Amino acid sequence: MIKKYYFFLFIIGSIANAQVKILFDATKLQMAGSADWVIDADVHNLYTNNTITTTGTESNPQRVPTPAQSAITASTPESYWNGALSHWAIDCVRQGYTVETLPWNGRITYGDATNVQDLSNYKVFIVDEPNILFTATEKNAIVNFVKFGGGLMMIADHTISDRNNDGEDSLMIWNDMMTTNTVQNNPFGISFDAADISQTTTSVAILPTNQILHGPPSTITCNVCGNVTQAKWSNGTTMTLNTNANASVTGLIFKSGSSTSGITNVMCASATYQSGKVVAVGDSSIPDDGTGDPNDTLYDGYIADASGNHQKFLMNATIWLATNSTMNTHDFEATLSSLRIAPNPIANKNLKLYFSNSSNLESEFSIFDATGRLVKQFHLIDSNMQNGCQEINCQDLNSGLYFGKFQIGAAFKTISFSILN
């Protein structure tokens, strides 16, 4: 039997030692009105209306929170940083993650080497209640981020919650992204409802092995994770799921009295899409730790509401989004070694892959262009290997940015590369 090989390339470092980075978005007026959905702001000078200027009093979060996250310990209070999402962010740091903010004037891109905060540099992207529509480029960037292995946390709020008075609220903005991007219509199978609900619910899906509802596997230590038994919405919304659009989409928490295995009245949901993952939440205030911008009235939804279940849910979900779903570190290391691509960018349109593999698993390599369109797909077999190198002819591809998806068995990983003339 011909042995087929598959290889993995990594965007940042190795799987064993790569630092998981989490990016909290602040480009969509997450600090507008009475909200302060940021992790830390040293300055409060933003004016948030149809446009953003530095002539106001709202939080203006910087890229890197201060004081330094390297000094955070188990006893560090959430007031260490100044933002209503600081407790969540500090919990992420305690978990070993690095957190950053995409500031109000940052750019949401995927595969743009000119952007130091390009989404390809992060494992998880958290967007709590956007108040401005995503541009066409941003919509495609977010969907491609998930498609090629990223984890997206999309949080909405109740209908008519437009905090900057531009006619668009968060649920409309999320629905617009999912239906008008040009990568795939409704890729996640999730639609936010035009609803406004306030209630405490114990209608949690019966999914005993679900890591978002019951915490990460025993190989991952998390002191604030655990079983989720309830949630409290304080003017939030619900979702309707479409399993025809995405067969993986799953309701996790439902309105009180609703079926816990249905596709309507969903308050929290999750899905996978290609190589990535999504978690959707219908109330923007559940991460609110009650402190932040002194000009806002904030409430503790993270710990005080729902008997602490919101902290468990959000950290369970964050870890799930940040964790590779189909193969663990040991499996990667056991299957692949001495992996490299040289050169990158690719010269003469001849892609050279260097790797060693003792696996007999079926393998496949797919190339996508910058829009997410599949342009090449084939298997790697040992008869084509010479001195540990597999050469791939890319003469039929134009110069530009591409993404490679490498799959062995059920496991996969993606990386960006460039082709020069």
Residue ranges of predicted features:
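Aromatic-Pro/Gly-enriched surface loop or interdomain linker
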Residues: 18-122, 302-305, 315-323
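C-terminal outer-membrane/trafficking sorting elements
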Residues: 333-421
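Residue-level detector of buried hydrophobic side-chain packing
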Residues: 92, 125, 149-152, 269, ...
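A glycine-centered loop/beta-turn motif at secondary-structure junctions
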Residues: 19-28, 34-38, 218-325
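Bacterial Sec-dependent N-terminal signal peptides
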Residues: 1-20, 329, 389-391, 412-414
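An acidic, glycine-rich "communication" segment
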Residues: 158-263, 271
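Helical hinge/lid and interdomain linker segments adjacent to catalytic or ligand-binding clefts
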Residues: 70-180
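Active-site-proximal beta-strand/loop segments in catalytic clefts of secreted hydrolases
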Residues: 25-28, 102-106, 127-131, 155-160, ...
